[in-house]
């Protein structure tokens, strides 16, 4: 595997509470997960608890409550006096058998939901903490500040999770061990029990089977995060299963014991909305900050005002130039995107000078993303520099429609407050040793979550291109890991380590070629014609991309795996296996707009798309699953799932793997790259859709389709 060695780095430090962070920082991955819920580059961490009452597991489950409960159970065995235990993801190892102190399927489900986001930069313990913020905000609750830096346990922790049959004195002693006084014990219990409820299958002495819908009794009558649980208790309103006469008979009326521990003083105060929200924000943050001694938490995560992303330095033009690509994310919470005229990078060359002239890199608008409380706009760029001058640092300049200019300098009071970008490895430099490290998620038999396994190999110099030396390293990966592993390239010299880290193996080419090869290659596609196209009825609907430097070859690469690709308006690229019947052929002369990246080529025009066909395309067929027929592409939605039985998410998902997971159910279906659903019945409102709507590929298998956005491929069991 040939690795382009480029390191983009900067020193970082977190300052006071909620101060603007300095990029890059240890929080960067979790900051994205926390704030990019929907839209462009959305991470989707909040999808599992959106809306508040939602659960992939069906109507008797509330994922938001399960996320909060998982954090409490993980933390609850901690000892604030000895510094042992706390929120350290030891719960991963504590779910064997019947669950012990952790009864119910919600813990495994929660950990499985977090697994796709688990990485070297987002520990499982930090994800559990982030889950509390996400679940509470999704349900309309207050902001629970999240500090990061938790270290995952490697074995089960001590016992000591509070159980409903405990006495009031035992509860007080257990919470004292955790670091909570009596008032905070009452508050954190009420804040945790404002969502969710009790399952009869888990606690039949508390909820008698058959006595509640779906054998699931809620703590109060609302699904949102509110003070209702406290209001009901103070007002004597029945409903909370942990204060009921049924629970009292078996001495499992846990909320009654806890709420009355200070003669109702705290629970009465919590019946006030303002008090409830402010108190819950405080005690839930306190809960997720019970950590083992030796763990140093960062300042609370705050959103960047301006955040660079996807930065890459690459040799180009046979080593005569350096290409610099990336994106700038601008926070638009208090400054709408419509007020921004342009975003620019103002840079210095290698020596810190301005021999580049104006030294400005322009950007183009890419899209917007939203979180619970913030919004963001993304601006992409691509620039090239002579290798002799290159680039060393830059500021970000935001120009508003009013003419006002705001310059962001990364909080660096020294060196003109600019981001620092390292040089490439020059052949006259003392390079020291270069190493390639690849991290994969390795399944383990003990737990539902994988382990992170890192393999490292030395890289050796291969050739020189201009003033640079190229290095290569070879490391074998199983096919299942090739599309979702992370890799780092590090240079150690004179005791200092510079690394280009947390890169996706999915971004690498599937084949290696000598750098600067000029061997002619024949394209694998032919021109299919010029066609009409409109935003309301696209000719190709499976995928879409916009690049300012678009070319025919670039669009072909972006649409690899699809039968057709098409170019429009100079910079737009569309993909699909079928062409819409609403798109009519037009004269070739009407597809006359030059491509943004090569003016000698044409890339469609306004409402005209130049379509090409992949000559080596192999039709994607639904695999034959013994005992099942492929039924078709159906509509689906998070609020009314087509199949509402079991669910699993797996980055290695295939049709065969989903069939195995569903284990003989009448229906199973695949959707949205990696999702698998099972069910005995189909939702009546789900309707058959065009096959082109189910044009997504599996994340790790480009030979099978995996539904689409709100579209699911359904397989039906044969009548025997």
Curated annotation (Swiss-Prot):
Residues 524-615, 627-718 form the WSC domain. GO terms for biological process: response to oxidative stress. Glycans are attached at residues 4, 108, 181, 264, 296, 318, 474, 549, 581, 629, 640, 663, 701. The keyword Membrane does not apply. Keywords: Glycoprotein, Repeat, Secreted, Signal. SUPFAM superfamilies: Heme-dependent peroxidases. It is found in: Secreted. Residues 1-24 form the signal peptide. Its main location: secreted. One of its GO terms (cellular component) is extracellular region. GO terms for molecular function: heme binding; peroxidase activity. Belongs to the WSCD family. PANTHER family: WSCD FAMILY MEMBER CG9164. This is WSC domain-containing protein ARB_07870. It comes from Arthroderma benhamiae (strain ATCC MYA-4681 / CBS 112371) (Trichophyton mentagrophytes).
């Amino acid at each position: 595997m040939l690795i382009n060695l480029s390191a983009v780095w900067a020193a970082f430090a977190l300052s006071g509470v909620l101060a603007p962070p300095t990029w890059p920082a240890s929080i960067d991955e979790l900051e994205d997960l926390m704030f990019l819920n929907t839209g462009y580059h959305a991470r989707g961490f909040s999808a599992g608890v959106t809306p508040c009452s939602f659960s992939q597991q069906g109507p008797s489950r509330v994922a938001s409550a399960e996320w909060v409960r998982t954090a409490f159970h993980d933390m609850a065995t901690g000892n604030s006096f000895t510094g042992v235990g706390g929120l350290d993801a030891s719960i991963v190892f504590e779910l064997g058998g019947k669950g012990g102190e952790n009864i119910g399927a919600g813990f495994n489900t929660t950990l499985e939901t977090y697994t796709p986001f688990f990485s070297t930069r987002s520990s499982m313990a930090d994800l559990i903490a982030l889950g509390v913020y996400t679940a509470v905000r999704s349900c309309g609750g207050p902001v629970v500040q999240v500090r990061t830096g938790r270290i995952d346990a490697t074995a089960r922790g001590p016992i000591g999770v509070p159980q409903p049959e405990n006495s009031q004195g035992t509860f007080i002693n257990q919470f004292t061990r955790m670091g909570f006084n009596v008032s905070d014990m009452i508050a954190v219990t009420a804040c945790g029990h404002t969502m969710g409820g009790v399952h009869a299958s888990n606690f039949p002495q508390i909820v008698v089977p058959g006595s509640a819908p779906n054998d699931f009794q809620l703590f109060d009558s609302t699904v949102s995060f509110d003070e209702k649980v406290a209001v009901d208790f103070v007002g004597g309103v029945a409903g909370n299963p942990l204060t009921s006469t049924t629970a009292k008979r078996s001495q499992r009326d846990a909320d009654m014991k806890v709420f009355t521990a200070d003669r109702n003083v705290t629970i009465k105060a919590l019946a006030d909305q303002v008090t409830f929200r402010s108190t819950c924000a405080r005690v839930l943050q306190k809960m997720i900050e019970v950590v083992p001694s030796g763990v140093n938490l960062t300042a609370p995560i705050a959103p960047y005002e301006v955040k660079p992303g996807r930065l890459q330095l690459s040799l180009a033009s046979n080593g005569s130039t350096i290409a610099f690509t990336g994106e700038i994310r601008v926070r638009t919470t208090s400054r709408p995107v419509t007020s921004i005229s342009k975003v620019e990078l103002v840079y210095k060359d290698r020596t810190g000078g301005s021999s580049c002239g104006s030294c400005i890199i322009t950007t183009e608008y890419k899209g917007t993303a939203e979180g619970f409380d913030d919004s963001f706009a993304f601006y992409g760029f691509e620039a090239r520099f002579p290798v002799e001058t290159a680039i060393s640092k830059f500021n970000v300049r935001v120009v508003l429609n009013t003419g006002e200019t705001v310059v962001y300098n990364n909080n660096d009071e020294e060196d003109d407050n600019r981001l620092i970008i390292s040089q490439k490895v020059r052949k006259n430099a003392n390079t020291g040793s270069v190493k390639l490290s690849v991290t994969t998620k390795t399944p383990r038999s003990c737990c539902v979550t994988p382990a992170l396994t890192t393999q490292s190999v030395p890289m050796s110099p291969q050739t020189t291109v201009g003033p640079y030396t190229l290095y290569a390293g070879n490391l074998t990966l199983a096919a299942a890991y090739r599309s979702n592993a992370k890799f780092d390239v590090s240079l150690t010299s004179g005791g200092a380590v510079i690394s280009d880290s947390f890169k996706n193996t999915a971004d690498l080419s599937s084949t290696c070629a000598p750098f600067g090869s000029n061997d002619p290659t024949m394209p694998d596609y032919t021109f299919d014609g010029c066609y009409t196209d409109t935003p309301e009825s696209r000719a190709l609907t499976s995928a879409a991309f916009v690049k300012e430097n678009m070319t025919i070859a670039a669009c072909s690469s972006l649409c690899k795996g699809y039968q057709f690709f098409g170019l429009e308006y100079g910079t737009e690229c569309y993909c699909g296996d079928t062409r819409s019947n609403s798109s009519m052929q037009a004269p070739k002369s009407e597809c006359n707009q030059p491509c943004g990246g090569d003016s000698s080529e044409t890339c469609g025009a306004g409402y005209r798309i130049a379509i090409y066909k992949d000559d080596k395309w192999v039709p994607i067929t639904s695999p034959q699953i013994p005992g099942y027929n492929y039924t078709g592409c159906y509509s689906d939605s998070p609020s009314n799932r087509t199949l509402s039985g079991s669910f699993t998410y797996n980055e290695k998902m295939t049709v065969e793997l989903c069939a195995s997971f569903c284990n003989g159910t009448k229906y199973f279906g695949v959707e949205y790259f990696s999702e698998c659903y099972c069910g005995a019945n189909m939702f009546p409102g789900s309707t058959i859709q065009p096959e082109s709507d189910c044009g997504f590929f599996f994340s790790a298998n480009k030979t099978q389709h995996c539904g689409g956005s709100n579209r699911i491929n359904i397989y039906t069991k044969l009548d025997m």
